[in-house]
From Swiss-Prot:
It is found in: Cell junction, Tight junction. This is Serine/threonine-protein kinase WNK4. PANTHER family: SERINE/THREONINE-PROTEIN KINASE WNK WITH NO LYSINE -RELATED. Residues 65-77, 630-641, 797-812, 844-854, 862-871, 943-952 have a biased composition (Low complexity). Residues 557-567 are annotated as: Interaction with KLHL3.
Amino acid sequence: MLASPATETTVLMSQTEADLALRPPPPLGTAGQPRLGPPPRRARRFSGKAEPRPRSSRLSRRSSVDLGLLSSWSLPASPAPDPPDPPDSAGPGPARSPPPSSKEPPEGTWTEGAPVKAAEDSARPELPDSAVGPGSREPLRVPEAVALERRREQEEKEDMETQAVATSPDGRYLKFDIEIGRGSFKTVYRGLDTDTTVEVAWCELQTRKLSRAERQRFSEEVEMLKGLQHPNIVRFYDSWKSVLRGQVCIVLVTELMTSGTLKTYLRRFREMKPRVLQRWSRQILRGLHFLHSRVPPILHRDLKCDNVFITGPTGSVKIGDLGLATLKRASFAKSVIGTPEFMAPEMYEEKYDEAVDVYAFGMCMLEMATSEYPYSECQNAAQIYRKVTSGRKPNSFHKVKIPEVKEIIEGCIRTDKNERFTIQDLLAHAFFREERGVHVELAEEDDGEKPGLKLWLRMEDARRGGRPRDNQAIEFLFQLGRDAAEEVAQEMVALGLVCEADYQPVARAVRERVAAIQRKREKLRKARELEALPPEPGPPPATVPMAPGPPSVFPPEPEEPEADQHQPFLFRHASYSSTTSDCETDGYLSSSGFLDASDPALQPPGGVPSSLAESHLCLPSAFALSIPRSGPGSDFSPGDSYASDAASGLSDVGEGMGQMRRPPGRNLRRRPRSRLRVTSVSDQNDRVVECQLQTHNSKMVTFRFDLDGDSPEEIAAAMVYNEFILPSERDGFLRRIREIIQRVETLLKRDTGPMEAAEDTLSPQEEPAPLPALPVPLPDPSNEELQSSTSLEHRSWTAFSTSSSSPGTPLSPGNPFSPGTPISPGPIFPITSPPCHPSPSPFSPISSQVSSNPSPHPTSSPLPFSSSTPEFPVPLSQCPWSSLPTTSPPTFSPTCSQVTLSSPFFPPCPSTSSFPSTTAAPLLSLASAFSLAVMTVAQSLLSPSPGLLSQSPPAPPSPLPSLPLPPPVAPGGQESPSPHTAEVESEASPPPARPLPGEARLAPISEEGKPQLVGRFQVTSSKEPAEPLPLQPTSPTLSGSPKPSTPQLTSESSDTEDSAGGGPETREALAESDRAAEGLGAGVEEEGDDGKEPQVGGSPQPLSHPSPVWMNYSYSSLCLSSEESESSGEDEEFWAELQSLRQKHLSEVETLQTLQKKEIEDLYSRLGKQPPPGIVAPAAMLSSRQRRLSKGSFPTSRRNSLQRSEPPGPGIMRRNSLSGSSTGSQEQRASKGVTFAGDVGRM
């Protein structure tokens, strides 16, 4: 019968947790006697419910715990008298426990105190038996069961925390079911790295809203982030795909950050101390600088205080949540990336760069300085967007108290991203500078040019040094680009000036000061460039600034450490073989084409912008040109291409150019510039233009397009699609293509007549050979990096030499492109004609010099502008044929004709003629002059020989009779009757041309011819004889040698004359150093089987004849620019004359080829050699097109063999394109090709 009351008592006990905590123990009844029978039912708290409260184990546990806590004070509580209870007949009242009494109730009766005691302390042995009766044992079991259950749950919880619920695919990382964070699209659990026993963060990212492409992009970003290790970047350990609750997710294992974020810190402390703000802001900047300096740069795009984590033990901060902006894009449906309060204005347009992280950093600093969320006054993102785009700052900006912090924040959150601070600027700011007790200062004023700087090292604590210095500064010299801060600090430690413990602070202080100086110099240089730019870009006059041959000033190294990767390519001088030029120079480089940074002689001088040297291509050049400068012209290098695009009439070198291009010290985000150039034009079947593009990633792309069938938009779209040009370069590319098309069509229309004759003589297999051209920067106001050159010259143009402009310094054709020789923008028109040696006269302001020393000797001679008709004096009357004797080779010095162009677009070029000189001999047409000018260096591309190509200069329009083969000259000097005889002179310094006895020499026709007008040019002749032009029958090029004519070149001139015709050593030096032009008559170097070379003896060389070069190319010999031609009033007459004169000389082509072939056979017969099979006359070889090789990795020798149009005869030795000559000297690298020598023992 007592079971029911016991059950009810247990329920009452479970409901008394609050009552027992608030009330003292109840007193006894009114009479002081214990009540008999079942106790009255206690009124329930929720009396409205009829049914009792259901049993709950959880409720029972809580009651037992609370009762156990209350047992300490409920038992000793003394009874207090209470008001008397109502009678028993009354309704049920609250149960009250009687006080402890000495009177024991009878067995079987119920006491109110027993259950309470049992509940409070069930382990008391002194409890009376009535307390543990049948009705009170059930309550005693409740606390025991609860304690056991609690212990069991505790163990289960511990097991759950120590037992992994998931593992990584490789088993290294474990996941525990302990959630430590949750975001909008990620959940973070605690994990463990079993290899290092370090706790990690296990992040599960939801990617169900991402598309397939976005998911792939995110995976790539995560893979990229794995390799990042920086003390201020949260470390990424691993990532993989996993299936969670039936959905694919990405798991990231990152470094565990348990001390919260900057956001939680601000919520807790509300205000951040300035020193903490300084330290943490500097650490954030370092982390951002590390991300932005990667290649390619890594952008955070969602930087805010919630993503900056605090490392508790060290008190440093780390940037986290990298790469999650891709997920956030899809997580917020159509919204943009990032948090609106921290988003830069350009983020809304999704056209951004590293500047967006600078903007977000400024907002983070604003929140740290004010403990107020930016734009908290705005109600929604739309209001924030309006304030951000309108340039209004958040209201909290005006609450910043520290002026320096306010200045930094203002510089970071500017609307224009170009006006914001950069990460480097912020790190160099005085507010973020660390106080390490070490200061480095400038000991002298920096002029921005000196490579060496005097610096002072000051240390605050005088006792820190190894020697007592009384806190005096240590002065030392630091060479920019050569010294390293660590090396300087190590030297100080070794000398005892600095303690070893101060090595790191000193090195860091020096490094930071040097970096600040370099940044300052860079800003000043950019400011000077902007000031020097003209208001409206226009075609400036063509200028060729001259620089001294051997540069004496070493240029400073790139200013930024990161600038090394932007260092422009410099090319070694004379490292290109003309036989391999089709492959090598088209790709702008060869196996020996890179300039070592340690080669000071080949580095541009400090005053010359390095961008001018980035495209210096050193090639066997034909001429040294000096084009007049009307003012302080801009410096420009002909760099990437080795031919002038002026000859095609498409020169746009100077269009849109400023005074100089950007120097190599660039921003980290600068990309390499692209270059576009025209290599050939043909209208044989279709009007096709072939161009070559150097892409932004230094790849060479050759493409052709039809003038009639392809539109510029289609070409640009294809280039962008194939990633040959950047989207930002598309507009500039379109402008260049349109300009190319317009100019090509203009030239094609003008030359339809003359070219019809050329097409008739072309063989079906011949195609116009591509011709390298000058790179031309695009006048793009948007700072595009695309450059183009629209040259249409023939491929046979190897180069024209650019000489430096320092007066008095001679030019050496052997080193035509010294790296310090910039070329200013402007139309450059190389008028290539046979080499000559004009005497000093006002009509020859420039001359090419031949020196046995191939070191650079640039000439400086300004070209005067002339308002009169351009002069083109080239008389042939004093140019006798050169011949090669069989015995010791004497020096032949034919008189030379001089070409002087007074037109500003035509630099005067010295030229000689290998035509027979007679008073009645008609001059060649001006058409052939232009044609031969373009074809002068044709053999250097086919199979070059050092020397000068002797070709006919322009002649007045008169019929040219067939030239008979001259009879050989006897060894004794006797000369058979012939109108064409070489003028023989001694090996010593040749005297001026004068009449000689008929037995030995022919009397000169005339000392000096009267000027003759040919078209728009005046042709005159010079008195001074030229160097001999020995014949080179089997070589595609026949070399001669020009002689210097400027007054300041007397010593070099005499040296050349002494060495011109003498022994093999002098002739080898002459051949090695003379690259100014190449002729049809040259000495042929032939080696016998026994290693000795037979000397040529006996009769003089047969006549060499000019080549009909107009048969060999299409529209590549047009030497007049469209701008110059359009400005002249005599264009129509000039072009009509060209057409007629070309027709007249077509008949001579076959005669010349026949004569030359016979001359080669006669030479072999005189030498006692068997003529090689397939002899082709040099004039005929010019017409054979060179094979174009793919940009494969052929060895140089293999390329030489692949590109030879004709196999060389027996005994011909080919020089390696890398070694240059047997001496292997660097100065002689330009001399490679096929040559014959008259010496016996020399290789």
